[in-house]
Amino acid sequence: MDNRYYRHNRRKYSLKVHIVLVTKYRKQLLQGSIADDVKQKILDIANTRGYEIIAMETDKDHIHFLLSYDATDRVCDIVKIVKQETTYYLWQKYNSVLSKQYWKKKIFWSDGYFACSIGEVSSATIQKYIAVSYTHLRAH
């Protein structure tokens, strides 16, 4: 995928972004089935919207993913969609768990996010970083 460019109409592009989302109040909820369901939901969103998830891992309070997207999409819109759809899905499935953690509003993610385009860094480097970070964090 690194050297492949997408073509659409008169556009030729290769856009990839490394995104990190953090749970509200850094609650350590991204474990077990919740982590698995968040990852699956993000994959579903990507498939529906035409994004490609290149790499994705969770730690207890945040998730990293490397995403390839269309030139007509904006990163802020991608993040908004991912946050909204995963939050809605998780509250439907884990209402009893989440209502004990967030009792005022149906929230899951913190307000902000980290996003970094990888134009100067190879996709393989970011994939390795995500995998190594995940392995290192799980060991501690």
Where in the sequence are the language-model features?
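Basic nucleic-acid-binding interfaces
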Residues: 1-134
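Conserved small/polar residues in nucleotide/adenosyl-binding loops
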Residues: 135-140
